[in-house]
Curated annotation (Swiss-Prot):
It comes from Amanita phalloides (Death cap). This is Antamanide. Belongs to the MSDIN fungal toxin family. It comes from the Eukaryota. Antamanide reduces multiorgan injury induced by IL-2, such as lung, hart and kidney edema; but does not have the toxicity of related cyclopeptides such as phalloidin. Cyclic decapeptide that belongs to the MSDIN-like toxin family responsible for a large number of food poisoning cases and deaths. Counteracts the lethal action of the Amanita toxins phalloidin and alpha-amanatin if administered before, or simultaneously with, the poisons. Acts probably through competitive antagonism. Its concentration in the fungus is, however, so low that the toxic action of the latter predominates. Shows immunosuppressive activity, probably through the inhibition of the action of interleukin-1 and interleukin-2. Processed by the macrocyclase-peptidase enzyme POPB to yield a cyclic decapeptide. POPB first removes 10 residues from the N-terminus. Conformational trapping of the remaining peptide forces the enzyme to release this intermediate rather than proceed to macrocyclization. The enzyme rebinds the remaining peptide in a different conformation and catalyzes macrocyclization of the N-terminal 10 residues. The lineage of its organism: Eukaryota, Fungi, Dikarya, Basidiomycota, Agaricomycotina. Disulfide bonds: none annotated. There is a cross-link at residues 1-10 (Cyclopeptide (Phe-Pro)).
Amino acid sequence: FFVPPAFFPP
């Protein structure tokens, strides 16, 4: 299953 990233770069 796909798990979206919890942290995104600024």
